[in-house]
Design a protein with these regions (language model features):
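Nucleic-acid nuclease catalytic cores
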Residues: 1-8, 15-47
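Short glycine-/polar-rich loops that comprise or flank the Walker A/P-loop
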Residues: 24-27, 62-63, 126, 163-166
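Short, structured patches in soluble enzyme cores that scaffold and shape functional sites
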Residues: 31-33, 68, 105-107, 209-211
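Domain-level recognition of nuclease-like catalytic cores that cleave nucleotide substrates
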Residues: 34-90
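Aromatic/basic micro-patches that form nucleic-acid/chromatin recognition or nuclease catalytic surfaces
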Residues: 64, 93, 135-220
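Long, charged alpha-helical interface segments
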Residues: 71-77, 211, 221-224
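GIY-YIG nuclease catalytic motif and its immediate N-terminal context
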Residues: 83-150, 167-176, 215-237
Length: 237
């Protein structure tokens, strides 16, 4: 999936190429994927939905291709492996402002925090991963979680007053993955806060604690990759 960060310039370039096509100019794009095991290509709608929407529009008229490459051991000569397929139906289905998400927070010191009706809870210092979902307006929901000034509503709102947000990880999807994500993170987390953020489901928790930033853990990033990308292979079948 491309890009790995928001690219406003990339979005504009794609739309400019499409506009040139409309004027009768033959235009195209070549994406080189430096991973020889790749079989399909999609714009990363989780990271940059605006670019993904622009790509979906422009792909209909551009002469474009995505090519997987294999490098030799000395990293001097790339070898073409295969042209990648474009599962555009996945993009049409999944690129919406809804889905599931994880918010990574840092608590600098041990704290006893009042969490609404749950009362006071002890939180060891460290990093916390909160899992949630939004059936619509997910971008606005994530922006809200990052603000401190707001009316208290969810459990996470109370904790946010004492933490800094280090990452937000949207997983745009029409599927209901929130509880699967929570169970996956729970399986690798050293501890969780019982009953946090899960009053409407049977999960043990939706808040999971780590001594160090989970963004730097391979098992956590594997969860991100699995829910953002690897599960799409099943949908394609």
């Amino acid at each position: 999936m491309f890009p790995d960060a928001v690219t406003e310039r990339g979005r504009k370039h794609i739309l400019e190429l499409a506009a040139m096509h409309d004027k009768g100019i033959h235009t195209g794009v070549l994406f080189l994927v430096h991973w020889d095991k790749a079989h399909w290509f999609l714009p990363d709608y989780h990271t940059d939905p605006a670019f993904a929407s622009a790509f979906a529009q422009a792909a209909l008229v551009l002469d474009w291709k995505a090519l997987a490459l294999r490098w030799d051991a000395r990293f001097t000569t790339p070898m073409p492996v295969r042209l990648l397929t474009y599962p555009e139906e996945i993009l049409r289905q999944e690129n919406e402002d809804r889905g599931d998400y994880m918010v990574v927070l840092q608590l600098a010191a041990d704290a006893d925090i009042s969490i609404g009706a749950k009362g006071q809870i002890h939180f060891p210092k460290g990093y916390y991963v909160y899992t949630g979902s939004a059936q619509k307006n997910m971008a606005a929901r994530l922006a809200r979680h990052q603000r401190k000034r707001k009316q208290m509503h969810w459990h996470i709102d109370y904790l946010r007053q004492h933490c800094s947000v280090t990452a937000v990880i949207p997983i745009r999807t029409t599927a209901d993955l929130e509880h699967d994500i929570a169970r996956a993170v729970d399986a690798i987390a050293p501890w969780h806060i019982p009953g946090f953020g899960c009053t409407d489901c049977r999960c043990a928790s939706h808040l999971f604690g780590f001594e160090d930033n989970p963004i730097h853990r391979s098992d956590f990033m594997q969860i991100v990759e699995d829910f953002r990308m690897n599960r799409l292979t099943v949908l394609m079948q």
